[in-house]
A protein has these predicted regions:
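Glycine-rich active-site loop/strand segments that organize a redox cofactor
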Residues: 4-8, 72-135, 252-260
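Glycine-rich dinucleotide-binding loop and its adjacent helix/turn
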Residues: 13-35, 130, 186-245, 249-251
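N-terminal Rossmann-like FAD-binding beta1-loop-alpha1 element of flavoenzymes
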Residues: 38-70, 226-244, 249
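Phosphate-coordination loops involved in phosphoryl transfer and adenosine-cofactor binding
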Residues: 42-44, 152, 221-223
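Short hydrophobic core segments
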Residues: 46-48, 155, 175-190, 225-228
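Conserved Rossmann-like nucleotide-cofactor binding loop
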Residues: 53, 77, 189, 233, ...
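Helical element adjacent to the flavin cofactor pocket in flavoenzyme catalytic cores
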Residues: 131-149, 155, 185-190
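A conserved short coil-to-beta-strand element within the FAD-binding core of flavoproteins
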Residues: 151-165
Length: 260
């Protein structure tokens, strides 16, 4: 698999890679000149979500000259998104050579991050990106760009107020935020909550869990486990249960055949 045109990256080290990226950004006059007229007490843009998509939105806006931006995420620092919370696959499913959130900067790609530590030979030998390693890369991305994510902050309500939006928040220094624009970068959580049948929610809580919950798989040792569904998260959790010593795992599927 061919590599990107990222010369002299191998074994460079993350500190030197950061300096290389900083030099590249300086050459592009980053960050862009602030052109937005300020309004007292108003944030220009609020981004809900400080994971991969939220961070690249921040980089895009900052590159374009917007400075008055707030990035909010309800997770604790370093645990944004699913990667080290409820995602349980061993590797990412996408090809390793996708550019991801690099926004056109070769030194900001996962490949550059990986090769700076392990070299080109290890990169060529790598099949899929390990899930936890991907989160390590995203943490480096945040730290390198100095993205001011406000962790532990939830947006509870959004209401119009004239030509602005007022956000009711919890976990912040103020109860509300007034903003011009709002970007939802909430990932899969943004499409709604888990769809759990009532007959399941009426069971004792120690007998069931949703795939997005924190699960102690060790308690499933020698147990018979039923998994409702056969999507990606269902397969991942079934594998996790078997690896933890479950005696049997059965998938309950409405379809006559496995979806392809």
């Amino acid at each position: 698999m061919p590599s990107f045109e990222t010369d002299n990256l191998d074994y460079l080290g993350l500190t030197a890679l950061r300096e290389r990226l900083k030099s590249d950004l300086n050459s592009l006059l980053y960050p862009g000149k602030n052109w937005v007229p300020p309004r007292n007490g108003v944030t220009d843009t609020v981004i809900i979500g400080g994971g991969m998509c939220g961070m690249v939105v921040w980089l895009s806006l900052t590159t374009g000259g917007m400075r008055n931006i707030r990035v909010l995420d309800r997770a604790v620092e370093g645990h944004e998104g699913p990667w080290v919370t409820y995602a349980r696959m061993e590797t990412l499913r996408s090809p390793k050579n996708l550019t991801g959130p690099a926004f056109g900067h070769g030194a900001l790609t996962f490949q550059a991050w990986y090769r700076a530590q392990f070299g080109a030979a290890e990169w060529e030998a790598l099949d899929k990106i390990p899930r936890v390693m991907w989160m390590d890369y995203l943490r480096w991305y945040r730290d390198t760009l100095n993205i001011p994510i406000e962790n532990g902050v939830s947006v509870d309500r959004v209401e119009p107020e004239g030509d602005l939006l007022r956000l009711t928040v919890s976990g912040s220094t103020t109860d509300t935020i007034l903003c011009r624009k709002l970007v939802f970068a909430t990932g899969r959580d943004g499409i709604g909550g888990p769809n759990i049948p009532k007959f399941i929610t009426q069971l004792p809580s120690h007998l069931w869990a949703h795939s997005a919950n924190k699960i102690d798989f060790s308690v499933l040792k020698d147990k018979r486990v039923a998994v409702i569904g056969v999507g990606a998260s269902a397969i991942d959790n079934a594998a996790e249960a078997l690896e933890a010593g479950a005696r049997e795992v059965r998938h309950l599927v409405r379809r006559a055949e496995m979806p392809t």
